[in-house]
Amino acid sequence: MQGIAKIKEKIFEEATEQKNRIIEKAKKEAAEILEKARKQAVQLEAEAEKKAKKVAREEKRKILSIAELEERKRYLEAKQALINEAFVSAEKKLLNLESEKYRDLVYRMILAAAVDGNEEIIVSEADKEKITPELLERVNEALKKQGKAGNIRFSGEKRAIKGGFILKSATVEINCTFDYLLKVQREELETEVARILFEE
């Protein structure tokens, strides 16, 4: 009987030791798993923070880029408005010249534009007080001295003209209205006007 008891005791001891080994191993594995999980959590947190910072930087860059584009757009709009204002102002100054200066300007413009001196001149109703028959007489005398016909005369035709004139012959029309001349030269003049308005 004692032999059986000893065998049982031995088996119990071995079972207890094995149980303890299993428990220790399980505890060790659990600790390793927890440590690994903790490290992974720290790594994931760091990666998430890194990604969040990257996203934040990208968003900031986008916002700044959009803001810069908006600022540039507003600047260009303001610049264009000032250039427009400069050209409108130039046309107003031409239209509001003193009668004598206006006549002198038109006189020189007709002499420069006349092809053979045998054209009709179309003017606005408002300009008929400034562009007078006497002015055309002066023009025709000067044209004759240049060897041209000297037969510039008023046309009965009416056009929507603010200032300046249109010379018309049987074959050609020469538009010397102020708004047209400014429009034609605007592209060339715009660069110079912009330089004057915005030079630093």
From Swiss-Prot:
GO molecular function: ATP binding; proton-transporting ATP synthase activity, rotational mechanism; proton-transporting ATPase activity, rotational mechanism
This protein's UniProt keywords: ATP synthesis, Hydrogen ion transport, Ion transport, Transport
GO cellular component, one term: proton-transporting two-sector ATPase complex, catalytic domain
Coiled-coil stretches: none
A biological-process GO annotation: proton motive force-driven plasma membrane ATP synthesis
Domain of life (superkingdom): Bacteria
InterPro entries, alphabetized: ATPase_E_C, ATPase_V1_Esu
Cysteines paired by S-S bonds: none
Family membership: Belongs to the V-ATPase E subunit family.
Role this protein plays: Produces ATP from ADP in the presence of a proton gradient across the membrane.
Protein name: V-type proton ATPase subunit E
Species of the source: Thermoanaerobacter sp. (strain X514)
Lineage of source species: Bacteria, Bacillati, Bacillota, Clostridia, Thermoanaerobacterales
Gene of this entry: atpE
